[in-house]
């Protein structure tokens, strides 16, 4: 009996390991590692930017540069939003594309990220006086959460563009720590956040290397948060202008609700929610994100394509008006 049980257990374990290995290959992400700065440098036409914490690249404008600087961030994948930086640079803007964790001298994971690293960014911009003002900060997903937190603390920021934003601060993403940690700190103090609940089904899917939709996790996190008011990002403190984008089928978190709430609390923020779009907009989402996108990101192929085209048009209309020659 015992040998038969042992054989059955071994068979099940091997089957699980085999399925997980297949899923790792089947759902592997496309393209370069977003955290690899060498991959950005190899594309050329960039200059490294570095400080004590600040890491990233400067993208000098093509052609006659518009006044000011656009600072861009990506999200929890750890990139510097290279594609968006190049797209904006090609339209005549000086752009700084920055990492905010995962690089040498930075937090290894998206937790305890010191917001005051933006002091270094402002100092770098000031040294390049021809591109000093205005300053627009653009962020995507957790990078949008970062951008909103910077905007309410730094009056030097004139404009913000938030893709798939959050209206609240959420727990940091550090899977090597059992204890909950904040995403951000300010002057060495943690920024209040809503903790993420534990769902066994999510753990199983992660173990099996299957894509996960986290929207329910974030919705439950906010609904159950005893410190909801403290975790709220007080966007009404931001006195500049802003543009907010979301898809109504975002599978990562409730960015559509966040766009509504943020734009209601600050009337200088223009919110746009695209039907049929998910967490990230793309003209070819299959090619760009592979097989993970329907579950993790949401939306439809056509909806995400339309959102990318329409949001790009509106983005450059607003950037052109914010960064006008005087």
Can you name each region flagged by the protein language model?
Residues 22-65:
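N-terminal cap/lid segment of alpha/beta-hydrolase-fold proteins
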Residues 85, 253-265, 286:
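Short alpha-helix in the alpha/beta-hydrolase fold that links the catalytic acid
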Residues 66-75:
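Short beta-strand element of the alpha/beta-hydrolase
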Residues 238, 244-246:
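Short beta-strand/loop motif that positions the catalytic acidic residue
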Residues 129-141:
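Alpha/beta-hydrolase fold nucleophile elbow
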Residues 108-129, 149:
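Alpha/beta-hydrolase active-site loop
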Residues 161-235:
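Accessory cap/linker subdomain of secreted extracellular hydrolases
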Residues 90-105:
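Conserved alpha/beta-hydrolase
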């Amino acid at each position: 009996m015992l040998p038969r049980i042992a054989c059955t257990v071994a068979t099940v374990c091997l089957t699980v390991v085999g399925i997980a290995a297949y899923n790792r290959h089947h759902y592997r992400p496309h393209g370069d590692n977003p955290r690899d700065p060498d991959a950005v440098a190899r594309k050329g036409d960039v200059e490294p930017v570095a400080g004590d914490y600040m890491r990233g690249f400067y993208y000098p404008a093509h052609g006659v540069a518009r006044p000011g600087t656009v600072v861009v961030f990506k999200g929890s994948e750890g990139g510097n939003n290279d594609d968006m930086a190049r797209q904006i640079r090609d339209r005549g803007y000086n752009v700084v594309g920055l990492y905010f964790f995962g690089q040498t001298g930075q937090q290894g994971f998206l937790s305890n990220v010191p917001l005051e690293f933006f002091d270094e960014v402002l100092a770098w911009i000031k040294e390049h006086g021809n591109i000093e003002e205005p300053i627009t900060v653009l962020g995507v997903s957790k990078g949008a959460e970062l951008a909103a937190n910077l905007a309410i603390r730094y009056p030097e920021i004139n404009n913000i563009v938030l893709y798939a934003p959050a209206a609240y601060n959420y727990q940091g993403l550090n899977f090597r720590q059992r204890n909950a940690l904040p995403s951000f700190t300010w002057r060495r103090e943690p920024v209040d956040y809503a903790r993420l609940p534990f769902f066994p089904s999510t753990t199983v899917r992660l173990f099996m290397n299957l894509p996960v939709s986290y929207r329910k996790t974030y919705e439950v996190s906010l609904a159950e948060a005893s410190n909801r008011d403290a975790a709220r990002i007080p966007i009404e403190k931001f006195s500049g202008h802003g543009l907010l984008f979301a898809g109504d089928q975002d599978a990562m978190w409730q960015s559509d609700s966040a766009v509504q709430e943020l734009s209601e609390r600050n009337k200088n923020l223009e919110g746009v929610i695209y039907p049929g779009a998910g967490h990230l907009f793309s003209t070819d989402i299959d090619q760009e994100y592979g097989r993970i996108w329907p579950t993790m990101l949401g939306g439809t192929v056509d909806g995400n394509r339309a959102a990318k085209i329409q949001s790009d048009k509106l983005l450059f209309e607003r950037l052109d008006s914010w960064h006008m020659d005087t």
